[in-house]
């Protein structure tokens, strides 16, 4: 059984499909639209994690949590367009910031943004499940509810004592957070 919010989608789908055909739009535009979505959302079908961009309030909250002295490493799992990383890097010169993004277009935007800001960020295109979390002092995740339990298992196995796992918005099932901001 489907969730109730699918009902309006089913009701409007056919009329919209017929209206679109009546507009006689070139199929090239549909290809461009599809490829754009593919570049933006990448492997969402596999990861179950769409593109979420961190807000300014998250930037402000993270600035209070990160160490003010002593070098530290920070990784953003699913770093999107790199806004969070560049903002944090501009405030915390003592940090080395890493971003891992699986969608091609946000990763490219992040790399270009990083080149323009000349910050201490290192952006990688790939799957964060393939990275070793023991290399980082702070692991930040703004993913979705789907991978949180697996993320916790990976973090528990790989992260060093004293390192910090920060989850934005989505709870880890069965785990009480040490602190909520």
For every predicted segment, state its role.
Residues 1-9:
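Membrane-helix interface "capping/anchor" motifs
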Residues 10-49:
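Transmembrane alpha-helices and immediately adjacent membrane-cytoplasm interface residues
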Residues 44-158, 164:
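Membrane-proximal soluble helical/coiled-coil segments
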Residues 162-171:
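Conserved beta-strand signature within the Rossmann-like core of class I S-adenosyl-L-methionine
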Residues 171-181:
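Active-site capping/gating segments
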């Amino acid at each position: 059984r489907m969730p109730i919010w699918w009902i309006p989608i089913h009701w409007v789908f056919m009329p919209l499909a017929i209206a679109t055909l009546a507009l006689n739009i070139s199929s090239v535009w549909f290809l461009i639209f599809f490829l754009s979505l593919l570049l933006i959302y990448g492997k969402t079908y596999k990861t179950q994690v769409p593109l979420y961009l961190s807000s300014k309030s998250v930037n402000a909250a993270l600035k209070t949590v990160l160490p003010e002295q002593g070098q530290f490493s920070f990784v953003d799992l699913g770093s999107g367009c790199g806004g969070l990383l560049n903002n944090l890097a501009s405030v915390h010169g003592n940090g080395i910031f890493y971003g891992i993004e699986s969608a091609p277009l946000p990763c490219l935007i992040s790399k270009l943004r990083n080149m323009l800001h000349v910050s201490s960020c290192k952006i990688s295109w790939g799957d964060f499940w393939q990275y070793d979390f023991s290399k980082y002092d702070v692991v930040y995740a703004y993913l979705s509810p789907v991978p949180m339990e697996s993320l916790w298992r990976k973090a528990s196995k790989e992260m060093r004592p004293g390192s910090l796992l920060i989850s934005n918005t989505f709870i880890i099932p069965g785990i009480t957070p040490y602190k909520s901001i």
